[in-house]
């Protein structure tokens, strides 16, 4: 651990030789890097719920004009549940 400000090195990666491997593995913030990527990483789908949204849109389009009719009813004064002015 650093004792003073001079001991801190910013934006530097350290390399060490792994005992069980004959390859160099570099570490950045304690995470091992191999070939510029995080070691043994798997692809992660960040927006997995986006597929469900797209499927929902397709299903609503297949149901016809029923959703448009429901929207029109909500626009009639007095039929909205919150009765807030538009």
From Swiss-Prot:
Molecular function per GO: protein folding chaperone
Keyword Secreted: no
GO biological process terms, semicolon-separated: maintenance of seed dormancy; response to heat; seed dormancy process
Family designation: Belongs to the LEA type 3 family.
Additional record remark: Boiling-stable protein.
Reported function: Protein chaperone involved in seed maturation and dormancy maintenance after high temperature fluctuation (e.g. secondary dormancy after 3 days at 40 degrees Celsius), probably by protecting heat labile proteins required for secondary dormancy (e.g. G6PDH, HOP3, SR45, ECP63, SCL33, RPL32B, ChlADR1, MSBP1, MBF1B, At3g01690, At1g15280, At1g15290, At2g31410, At1g11630, At1g65090, EMB2279, EMB1674 and RPL35C).
Name the UniProt record assigns to this protein: SEED MATURATION PROTEIN 1
